[in-house]
C-alpha cells in the first residue's frame, strides 16, 4: 500500500529540502530565490561539497503551510538548470 506525502505531514510543519547541483557560485542564490517565491523568510542554507568538488548539496528548511507548497517547491527547485536532484 502506497502512503501519500500529505497523509504523513501535518501542516504547518518544518520541511527540509536537499538540493544537489553543480558546484557553481549561483546555485545557492537560485535555490533561495525559488524558495522565497513560495515561502518568504530569512534562510541560512547549509552547503556541502561533494568529495571531488564537482557538486554541492544545499539544505534549506522552510515552514510549510500546505501540501501544494511542498510539491510546487520540489518541482521548481528541480527545474533549475544546474540542479541534478531534489530530496
Curated annotation (Swiss-Prot):
Taxonomy, superkingdom: Bacteria
InterPro entries for the chain: UPF0250_YbeD-like, YbeD-like_sf
Signal peptide range: none
Pfam family, one: DUF493
GO CC terms: cytosol
Protein family (similarity comment): Belongs to the UPF0250 family.
Name used for this protein in its record: UPF0250 protein PC1_1177
Source organism of this protein record: Pectobacterium carotovorum subsp. carotovorum (strain PC1)
